[in-house]
């Protein structure tokens, strides 16, 4: 069992590096009801994968990393957590970090260093892990932390624009390629940075690196969308990875040198894939994909079939009107594309034979060897070859975007990121575009000059950095310098990168003590969670803490050691707030530890008789900010009711909206947008002073999530929602969420910038961050066409302060080859990134457009890409076949799931939809697909099912046809877990799982426990493994058939026909019909 880190446990990158904490002390569709005008569904697929070829889960967090073997690496059996417990409890204890790690100047980089994860702040490693969620010019973030989510700081993405001359694209259309390189907004307000959410750039919306306004916690990575017209280099070898076969300990993952390469099998939904977890391969036979055409081959627009291309026909009941359809009269639901399974972990080398390797699926289990390009955990592109022209990108119908998450959590067996100190001179940079030295800058003139791979400028090599070139034209010391042979590296920042001395680590807790919060137990749960995580805060004189409570007034506490007990200081004016005795409100943890623990014990009883129903949330947040303003840091707010008095007071818009507005139109425009600009204005100020705000909503009513979530989104923070809050089942999740937020690797005062090769321009940014300056660099003129055979580079630079007060620059570089062939783009498509981009775009559109229009745009985005493939790349001439490219064969399924997701429904709570939108904005790429297409497993047969060594059984398709009244099923989407119990479950199974004899006896306030039998133990192990994969403590909700909770569970059966959309088979028919209409 993998347990969360208990109080006193070490922080990540301390003596031990651990993952996120895990524990605490519709109706059935008719597959035959198809639309007319369809004859066949065909798939272009590679040969079936060998059995057991999927990735396996990595060792549990907190386990010592496994070094890479010298020759045949052996991954070993799946690792399990600690021995079973009677019920989930706090994680095993770990030591707290002591002080900042010493930073030395690395003389050289040893290539034979074992790929182990750092166990503490090493002398040459970054102070925090590389691990949760946006970039162009510099983006500022209050604080960045490396969270379990994919994205750095708040999550976001950066989209790159096509070259100049291109017209703006509609939703779902690929961005035009802009000329010139572009950088993320130079004005993102910095703050703590974390690896939580991803940021997305133009071209997509993956969770990528974000720039929070203040402290940056590990947010999701932002995505950056690159422009469509880059230049090219020698065309890369065929994209696609060869199939992984057998069960070797670690299977090397490399791109084949000759076509045709087989694509990766569908990956499981978990962040690390679980062995035996994915769906089995479809029953239909598949043919190998085409290899890449020769380098100089011209585009094959409208040309005949490419060699080795084949399809699988799936007969249907529908044909052209009046036509006779031979063969079976039904589509077999078992033969349509579904996520595949893979169980074997792989070793992925980022470059091979001087070209980029296509990355494995984001949800699979892989160990990265950085051989020049950065790990795909830090930066992924939606297409792994860059189109040479904007017209080619436009024709493909696909998005071009970068998913950036510079602080993503790395695999325990991966080599730590190297830290390089150039001394007072700072890192070597291009004097024109300011790009950082990287493996793709070419040295010439015996090493005296180098050519920038971003702007093409020839610069002088600094004297103290000169080295002669070898016969191959490379520097002789290239393998000894991490910045010349690694795609990700950290530089020690010099004084020119500091506006002020590095800020200390400040943690301020703000607790709701209104009558509702006291009565529901939310206040007690918050105080208990804070008290337990105090021991996990970094030790030393640089750690400061503060605490305040609020109802209709604000209460600060003097924590100075000189006082015998904490002294309450009340601020009654909630319209013009102030902070009394600022120096006594935020104090060193070492000075106030005893007072703070005493205060946290006392708060629930101090206010237990309170009858104050109002909340001055806005005023309290403003007052806490004033207390932190001089230092910056992380502000964690625990809120239970709607802010009703003082600054930023809100009204219950939900009831008014339901009564007076159409859910399909005005609701989206009003209730999902902030009520006014008050909180947004406050948030921008917070970000400017490096204050990051995280909000923990422990409520049982409407709190206007759309308005209050503006603060975390702007400052690089996160929103955690516990609705309806239960004092019985929610405290464990609250504790684990808070612990992971605090203990994940993180930094402060973060600013990020993304640079692209000339010919490409960042067009749009998405994620949780604050932009201060749209652009801060004067770019030279750029061509709008890239050269076939050249390479296009992207670089993300994150400037941040570690928790030990060291200023660092994490530089992540990705170089991809350019192509002028449309077929190469489809082979190089990255489904995970493409879908994450579309998901984030849809979330951004929901508050301002009618839902039917958002759904239509998402569907058209899928249709346009498949139409382009059918028209220009497919070899079949019959219009009665639906041709799906291998890389995007699951795109229709995930698009359908998106249109049925919580954010696009009209029957849910407004706060639920607002939370979904906010959650997606910083969502990491590995968590995008599971959010809309969850993983479902059967529980009742875990003790008899052969899982082939995996803790998790293979997932089940999301269709009610696969649910039995005699079964128990568990469904999870990375945030919540639903446990469905059928009406006729055998009493023996119920006794083993719940210690009851009938389903009616199971309490609705369900708390998972482990009993002394094999079935219960295996279910607990499965839940713990999922929590480890998701870096989240899933809250488990009990669902019973015939009750509203049962309908909630069935609403996730996205393959069924429901009120919110057609069945999966029917949707494929609709997509096929639309493609036919375009073809005609």
Swiss-Prot record:
UniProt keywords (A-Z) are: Cytoplasmic vesicle, Endoplasmic reticulum, ER-Golgi transport, Golgi apparatus, Membrane, Metal-binding, Protein transport, Transport, Zinc
One CC-aspect GO term: COPII vesicle coat
The record's section on InterPro entries has: ADF-H/Gelsolin-like_dom_sf (IPR029006), Gelsolin-like_dom (IPR007123), Gelsolin-like_dom_sf (IPR036180), Sec23/24_helical_dom (IPR006900), Sec23/24_helical_dom_sf (IPR036175), Sec23/24_trunk_dom (IPR006896), Sec23_24_beta_S (IPR012990), SEC23_SEC24_subfamily (IPR050550)
List the membrane topology term(s): Peripheral membrane protein
Chain intervals for the UniProt region annotation (Disordered): 1-189, 201-220, 316-367
Entry coiled-coil feature ranges: none
Subunit and interaction comment:
Component of the coat protein complex II (COPII), composed of at least five proteins: the Sec23/24 complex, the Sec13/31 complex and Sar1.
Where is the protein localized? Answer: Cytoplasmic vesicle, COPII-coated vesicle membrane; Endoplasmic reticulum membrane; Golgi apparatus membrane
Molecular-function GO terms, alphabetical: zinc ion binding
What lineage does the source organism belong to?
A: Eukaryota, Viridiplantae, Streptophyta, Embryophyta, Tracheophyta
Major subcellular location class: membrane
**Tissues expressing the protein:** Mainly expressed at low levels in pollen, leaves, roots and stems.
One example of a Gene Ontology biological process annotation? endoplasmic reticulum to Golgi vesicle-mediated transport
Q: Which function does this protein serve?
A: Component of the coat protein complex II (COPII), that covers ER-derived vesicles involved in transport from the endoplasmic reticulum to the Golgi apparatus. COPII is composed of at least five proteins: the SEC23/24 complex, the SEC13/31 complex, and the protein SAR1. Acts in the cytoplasm to promote the transport of secretory, plasma membrane, and vacuolar proteins from the endoplasmic reticulum to the Golgi complex.
Q: Where is this region: Zinc finger-like?
A: 430-455
Q: Which domain of life is it from?
A: Eukaryota
Q: Does the keyword Zinc apply?
A: yes
Which spans does this entry mark as compositional bias, Low complexity? 71-84, 142-160, 178-189
Name the family the entry cites. Belongs to the SEC23/SEC24 family. SEC24 subfamily.
Organism whose genome encodes this protein: Arabidopsis thaliana
Q: Where does Zn(2+) bind?
A: 430, 433, 452, 455
The name on file for this protein is Protein transport protein SEC24 C
Polar residues: bias regions: 12-43, 340-356
Residue ranges, compositional bias (Pro residues): 1-10, 45-70
